[in-house]
């Protein structure tokens, strides 16, 4: 049996809240996160469920692709498609210059490069330093300010290369948005990115 694997980029155009099915206390609703890294993700089971509901397929094709419904009387079998988790690549973060920064870190880029078999050199920022491209809008003097953090800015050609590569993958036919993305792209130290991925994500409240 031949298996075909494909990677896709999911672009959230508005706030996305993938819940965990439980609350923190009586108010806050947490988002799904990877257990080891604590980074936000969209579980593959959630993606598969949405695809099953939204794709315009015949019942037979849907059953072949996704398997029978769990409450179906017929014998159960696995579907022909397996959907992996959607892992975080870019996190938008409030910036004092440029309005918003599109942030990632070397840990995430290493996983992205592995999945796509990319050989580009991955910059690793020094402590308290943010790597930005050569045409960045995020600089304030020699600093960038994200949320309440001030970091030393380091213009870096490898960072510019990654900004352009990801921008073309996200906006293959829109050069204006490719430019917008590359001017706001930043690679953060892993620990700072993890901190912002926990504290700078939107909090939904139970009403």
Segments (PLM) and residue ranges:
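Basic, Gly/Ser/Thr-rich N-terminal segments that form RNA-phosphate-binding interfaces in CRISPR RAMP
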Residues: 1-207
């Amino acid at each position: 049996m031949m298996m075909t694997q494909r990677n896709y980029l999911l672009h959230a155009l508005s706030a996305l809240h993938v819940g965990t099915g439980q609350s923190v206390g009586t108010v806050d609703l947490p988002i799904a996160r990877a257990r080891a890294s604590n980074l936000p993700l969209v579980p593959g089971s959630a993606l598969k469920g949405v695809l099953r509901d939204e794709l315009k397929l015949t019942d037979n094709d849907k059953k072949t692709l996704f398997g029978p419904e769990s409450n179906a009387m017929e014998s159960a079998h696995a579907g022909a498609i397996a959907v992996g988790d959607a892992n975080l690549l870019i996190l938008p973060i409030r910036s004092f210059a440029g309005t918003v920064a599109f942030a990632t870190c070397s840990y995430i880029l290493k996983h992205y490069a592995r999945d796509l078999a990319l050989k580009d050199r991955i910059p690793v920022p020094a402590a308290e330093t943010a790597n930005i491209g050569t045409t960045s809008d995020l600089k304030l003097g020699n600093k960038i300010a994200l949320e309440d953090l001030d970091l030393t800015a380091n213009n870096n050609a490898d960072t510019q290369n990654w900004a352009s590569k990801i921008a073309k993958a996200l906006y293959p036919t829109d050069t204006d948005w490719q430019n917008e993305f590359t001017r706001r792209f930043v690679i953060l130290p892993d620990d700072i990115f993890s901190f912002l991925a926990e504290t700078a994500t939107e909090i939904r409240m139970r009403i």
